[in-house]
């Protein structure tokens, strides 16, 4: 398992390999396939996006739809694998420690670009994009909060504290305003849903958030010569034109959409077409409308968004069960989902293979726990009257 986690953490390209492995398991019938909302939803999204690609005569969108098929098979594998809490905790620990290596790589990357007289460079580490890198590290910080609650020794406490400092530094170096704001929202959700709240923890969390905010302000001011508010304004202003053009695309094809890579292929006809300078600067690398829900509407129309909302609705029903049962994992699951929603206002993290895999795995864990799919330890009762 560790080799597949390494492939996911260290490159968006090698992250595909574990997904292909899950396809192999499915074809050989080595995994059980349940008829649940995750499997129905992801497979339906795959079929509909493939159909949209065909109707739009887009080879790229047709091929990209198989990415959803890979998410579907990864989700099936996760449902079969994450049936024990020991496995879940083990994977979360491995992902965290490997992310430390990615964070160190990001710090080295920043130092290298400073030496090359490019201090404005935003790190992307092993995730290919600063915003996706920020989202990954923000999720890892939330995972560390959970792992701190499962610690068994004081040495683990010290280790996690050091790790969270390093990951936080790496997050700040991405300068991803969306990921940072999403993290603050995620931390808020984590602690209002946490069972074991005390004054010391609340003070510690407020201190961490305060220090991170101050550091973020300092970095934005010194490196990019702007403030977080200014960065938010710039970020929204650059996206408004994208959203306007994407909305036009949606109204042109509201049912079928333009295919998963429709924005990349046809967006130039709608987005910033009135401003050549912005058009050439932004549209050349734009693969989605920089909004989670608008991405579904443009790529797969109202049907695609409806399928996604079907998955989310049932996911929240399962999360409600976990909340009522006071499950230990619930704060983490709620916080990571909150992050997707918050950052989804200005980005679509599900287009990144590493974050997409994390999303479906967290979803599979939620489903398994809420629907009693976990393997429980059986207590063996010795009966002296029974001959062995």
Spans of features found by a protein language model:
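Transmembrane alpha-helices of multi-pass inner-membrane enzymes
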Residues: 18-25, 329-388
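A conserved mid-to-late transmembrane alpha helix and its immediate loop/hinge
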Residues: 168, 278-319, 342
């Amino acid at each position: 398992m560790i080799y597949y986690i390494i492939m996911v953490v260290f490159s968006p390209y090698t992250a595909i390999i574990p997904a292909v492995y899950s396809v192999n398991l499915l074809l050989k019938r080595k995994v059980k396939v349940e008829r649940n909302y995750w499997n129905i939803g992801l497979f339906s999204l795959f079929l509909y996006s493939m159909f949209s690609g065909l109707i739009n005569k887009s080879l790229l969108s047709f091929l990209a739809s198989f990415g959803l098929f890979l998410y579907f098979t990864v989700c099936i594998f996760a449902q079969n694998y994450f049936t024990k809490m020991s496995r879940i905790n083990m994977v979360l620990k491995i992902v965290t420690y490997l992310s430390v290596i990615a964070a160190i790589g990001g710090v080295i990357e920043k130092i290298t670009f400073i030496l090359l007289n490019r201090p404005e460079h935003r790190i992307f580490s092993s995730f290919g994009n600063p915003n996706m890198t920020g989202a990954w590290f923000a999720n890892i910080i939330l995972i560390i909060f959970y792992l701190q609650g499962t610690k068994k020794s004081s040495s683990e406490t010290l280790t996690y504290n050091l790790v969270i400092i390093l990951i936080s530094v790496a997050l700040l170096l991405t300068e991803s305003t969306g990921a940072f704001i999403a993290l603050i929202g995620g931390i808020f959700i984590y602690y209002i849903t946490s069972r074991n709240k005390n004054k010391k923890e609340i003070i510690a969390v407020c201190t961490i958030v305060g220090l991170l905010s101050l550091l973020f302000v300092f970095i934005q001011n010194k490196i990019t010569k702007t403030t977080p508010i200014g960065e938010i304004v710039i970020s929204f202003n650059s996206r408004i034109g994208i959203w306007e053009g994407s909305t036009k695309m949606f109204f042109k094809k509201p049912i079928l959409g333009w295919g998963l890579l429709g924005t990349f292929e046809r967006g130039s006809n709608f987005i910033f077409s009135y401003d050549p300078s912005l058009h050439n600067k932004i549209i050349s690398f734009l693969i989605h409308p920089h909004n989670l829900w608008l991405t579904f509407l443009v790529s797969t129309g109202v049907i695609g968004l409806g399928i996604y909302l079907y998955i989310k609705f049932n996911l929240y029903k399962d999360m409600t069960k976990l909340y009522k049962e006071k499950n230990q994992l619930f704060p983490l699951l709620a916080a990571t989902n909150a992050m997707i929603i918050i950052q989804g206002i200005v980005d679509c993290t599900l287009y990144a293979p590493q974050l997409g895999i994390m999303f479906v795995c967290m979803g599979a864990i939620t489903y398994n726990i809420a629907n009693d799919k976990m393997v429980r330890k059986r207590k063996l009762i010795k009966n002296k009257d029974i001959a062995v």
